[in-house]
Amino acid sequence: RDYYASRGLGDVYKRQDVFIATDDERIAEACRTYGMEYCMTSPDHDTPTGRIWEVSTKVEADLYLQIMGDEPLINVKAFDLILPDTLPEDPYYVAVLTNRMEHPADVIDFSNQKVVTNAAREILMISRSPIPYPKGTLNFEYEKVTGIQLYSRRALAFYHETPKSILEKAEENDMMRFVENGHKVHAIVSPYKTVSVDTPKDLALVSEILKGKE
């Protein structure tokens, strides 16, 4: 798993101004091997967003693009979908890329965090349950959140200063802290599929895909 995560980091690092946030010396060593910049963070963070907040206190920027290290299949073309051409007016700007789900088994898989939005593509709810429930119609495309997320500096400060919300605790999703407190989270559909390595099954799938690229 470490090998494939390192490969993913190597691909991402072709972009400019990239820092690897970690509390693990093994990852820091991989960064040194690849010649990457990294930021050592506290081991006490229990969420990735909390770790990125710490980075924002050390690295000055207007926006922080968070790329989860457990999604090594990320296509760098996806970054252009989430990075705005100009700075957003909302000082608490938060956005996430989503993937449409094509298989019923994926919809009921609790490791896939499903998302529903309003007409403006602002998130209403993120759940591990299959939402919405198709009682009245099946004419609906299910989506899941990915590990590509964008935060303004003030949004990260808000996250750090605000206690965990009820639904955030229940679903174990960081972005619900913003939603429950009235801040918009923009969902942007990406055609570039990602796979989060959460289970041995996921690891086997990703390993086969990456071996096919060698």
Explain the meaning of each model-derived region.
Residues 15, 61, 89-92, 183:
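Short, high-confidence coil segments that cap the C-terminus of an alpha-helix
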Residues 18-20, 64, 95, 123, ...:
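Hydrophobic/aromatic residues located in beta-strands of well-ordered beta-sheets
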Residues 19, 25-84:
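Short phosphate-binding loop-to-helix
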Residues 140-214:
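Conserved alpha/beta core of the MobA/IspD/sugar-nucleotide pyrophosphorylase nucleotidyltransferase superfamily
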